[in-house]
Amino acid sequence: MNDLNIPILKKTYDLYKDFYNLRLTVPKQDRYTLWQKCEGLLIEILQGLLYASQQSKTEKLPILEKTSVKLNFLKMCIRLMKDIKAISPKTYITVEATLDEIGKMLGGWIKSTKER
């Protein structure tokens, strides 16, 4: 898959793989509510990044901005999962650090798209 040569796509793809493996550590009562929402958002973010990577310069910006909003919402949901103790603080720190890195990459992509 050539698209994984794009660093932000690879980082998000790898995060999903890690996130998927954490599923069984989440209490069952949260697994089918908030966790499922987070997992869906992560897939939507991955889809948005892939879609944006294949668009012309003029069509990228709105897609990237929508993806950024989804990323911010995902961060909020992950924080909520930590606060309700659906995930451990250690898991939260790991996931949040990766999300921050993806956010910086996405912000840079948005900025470079606006400058063109």
Model-derived regions: residue spans:
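Amphipathic alpha-helical assembly/interaction segments
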Residues: 1-116
